């Protein structure tokens, strides 16, 4: 029997409770910062972002709102990154008029947006009260009364169609983290941690209204949005023949919503992908893939040559397959499941921001 004592804290204070030994677990809306990582006590080991100490439990949508006096109801991801990361940071209005951009909202939510977009400049201070600020943007997980919702596009010259890999129609999905104190877990804490990575726990997450890790499958015939994105937004290096081969190879397969993403130019998976590995392991043990063929399909961003990106996407697909084989203690997986590297093909987002590049740098699982 375990008794959970809960306290309502923001992310900063929750992580502080972990570091000071006042809590065993912290539910946060952002990852730990470098300053928080550096504040580990001597009796703690590892790091706050290590897969043993940090998992993405769910996702939630972040929304942007503007003042009613601002006629602009649309913004691309690249415009948003520029507004938050550049000086002076301008919010484009009609007739060529621009106003200084200001980001407001609760600290947790503004920091979650900045981490999501990989913009690490501190938000600009708001002008004194009473000063008109048509360039104000408010970030929130809830509806903001009397303000106007701003639609966010994945960018490039044309709006990108939704892709559905843990990032459906709304692109601003922020992870909800569960962080454990980086020290030896009590048995009950370890059991609870393991349970949260089971399909049953993810079903509960979805029931609560959050975006869960539960796998969803989509056939290639339902991927018209990805194909349109590839045709409209991929560099000329990505030949029509490559797209044809992608469709031929994936015909008859269904794409799972689980994906694995990598740090730029490496085969190192990010923290969210590490949690996906553990979740995938439990799906195997539950017999989810019994009697099915599986293919690990790698993709890249547009950094580097097209040929080099095909190779690195193939290497990443092989790395994920090998890691799964190790987790399952089944070396036959290295030969039993196919791998495919499609390089820059089928992009989920425009490559003109770090966020978009991270979305495209992935390995997907396709089954039939």
Region spans (language model):
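N-terminal segment of the mature folded domain
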Residues: 1-84
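Periplasmic OmpA-like peptidoglycan-binding domain that tethers envelope proteins to the cell wall
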Residues: 13, 299-368
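Ligand-binding pocket segment of bilobal, Venus flytrap-like solute-binding proteins
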Residues: 14-17, 102-164
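Ligand-binding "clamshell"
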Residues: 37-53, 60, 145-167
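Extracytoplasmic ligand-binding site segments that recognize negatively charged/polar headgroups
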Residues: 54-128, 146
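A bilobed periplasmic-binding-protein/Venus flytrap-type ligand-binding module shared by bacterial periplasmic
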Residues: 61-70, 168-169, 173-188, 262
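Periplasmic-binding protein-like
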Residues: 77-94, 195-220
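Periplasmic peptidoglycan-binding/tethering modules of Gram-negative envelope proteins
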Residues: 202, 206, 214-293
């Amino acid at each position: 029997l375990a008794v959970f004592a809960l306290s309502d804290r923001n992310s900063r204070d929750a992580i502080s409770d972990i570091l000071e030994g006042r809590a065993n677990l912290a539910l946060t809306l952002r990852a730990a910062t470098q300053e928080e990582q550096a504040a580990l006590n001597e009796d703690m080991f590892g790091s706050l972002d290590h897969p043993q100490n940090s998992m993405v439990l769910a996702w939630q949508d972040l929304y942007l709102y503007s003042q009613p006096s601002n006629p602009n109801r649309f913004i691309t991801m690249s415009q948003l990154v520029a507004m938050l990361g550049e000086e002076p940071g301008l919010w484009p209005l009609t007739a060529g008029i621009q106003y200084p951009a200001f980001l407001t909202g609760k600290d947790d939510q503004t920091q979650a947006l900045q981490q999501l977009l990989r913009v690490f400049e501190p938000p600009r201070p708001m002008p004194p009260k009473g000063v008109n600020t048509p360039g104000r943007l408010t970030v929130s997980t809830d509806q903001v009364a009397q303000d106007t919702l701003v639609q966010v596009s994945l960018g490039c010259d044309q709006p990108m169609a939704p892709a559905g890999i843990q990032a459906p129609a709304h692109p601003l999905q922020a992870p909800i983290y569960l962080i454990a104190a980086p020290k030896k877990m009590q048995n009950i804490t370890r059991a609870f941690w393991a349970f949260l990575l089971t399909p049953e726990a993810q079903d509960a997450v979805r029931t609560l209204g959050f975006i869960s890790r539960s796998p969803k499958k989509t056939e290639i015939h339902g991927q018209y949005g990805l194909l349109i994105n590839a045709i409209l937004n991929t560099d000329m290096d990505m030949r029509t023949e490559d797209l044809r081969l992608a469709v031929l190879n994936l015909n008859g397969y269904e794409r799972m919503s689980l994906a694995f993403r990598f740090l730029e130019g490496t085969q190192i998976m990010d923290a969210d992908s590490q949690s996906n590995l553990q979740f995938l392991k439990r799906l195997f043990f539950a017999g989810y893939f019994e009697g099915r063929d599986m293919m690990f399909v790698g993709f890249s961003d547009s950094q580097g040559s097209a040929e080099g990106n095909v190779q690195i996407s193939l290497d990443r697909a092989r790395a994920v397959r090998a890691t799964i084989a190790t987790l399952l203690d089944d070396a036959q997986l290295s030969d039993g499941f196919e791998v495919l590297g499609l390089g820059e093909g089928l992009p989920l987002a425009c490559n003109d921001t770090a966020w978009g590049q991270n979305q495209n740098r992935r390995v997907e699982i396709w089954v039939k």
